[in-house]
Amino acid sequence: MLDFDAIPRIDIALGGLLPQKRTMLLIDSARGTAGSVVASETTLGSRHELFAQRDGTFGSWILLELMAQTIGIYAGLKNRAEGSGPKVGFILGTRHFDARVPFFRAGDTIRIRGECIAYFESDLPSQFECVAYLGDAEVGRSRLTVYQPKDLTAFTHDS
């Protein structure tokens, strides 16, 4: 069970930590520590319509994006401590993504707990263990390998 309230609240606007535009910023609130744990919360609704299925439910794969944005908050806090702003990161892969429910409904509040297993400030990928909760029930789990390039232009087309 996730004791969400035991994790200190982050009093920084999420737009100051994540590079997504408001239309793609899926998380409502975040919590984190000076250590290796970060957590987020979101209530599913119309702004998550990109992930909606024809019947109005949200496929369990939305958990991967919520986990990725939670990890982005962790990276955003690190970047902010170093004096820089939000940076784009990539999911390189996932191990053992286990969704315990096939879908979610509008109004469901999902909480994500991410723990940094390995964080590299050099040009290496990092790993996070993430767990998703709906109420007290664990509804998903994954280990994500992520990468935040120092120079994003090395991965984009020349202008």
Show the residue positions of the predicted features.
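Short coil-to-beta-strand transition motifs
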Residues: 18-26, 104-111
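Beta-strand-rich interaction surfaces with strong enrichment in secreted/lumenal proteins
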Residues: 15, 29, 54, 99-103
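HotDog/MaoC-like acyl-thioester-processing domains
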Residues: 2-4, 73, 106-111, 115-159
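Short Pro/Gly-enriched beta-strand edge/turn motifs at strand-loop
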Residues: 8-14, 111-113
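Hydrophobic beta-strand-centered segment that forms part of the acyl-chain substrate-binding groove
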Residues: 73-113
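Catalytic strand-loop segment that frames the active site of acyl-thioester-processing enzymes
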Residues: 22-59
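Single-stranded RNA-binding regions, centering on S1/OB-family and related RNA-binding modules
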Residues: 1-11, 41
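Compact, glycine-rich, soluble single-domain proteins
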Residues: 55-74, 88-92
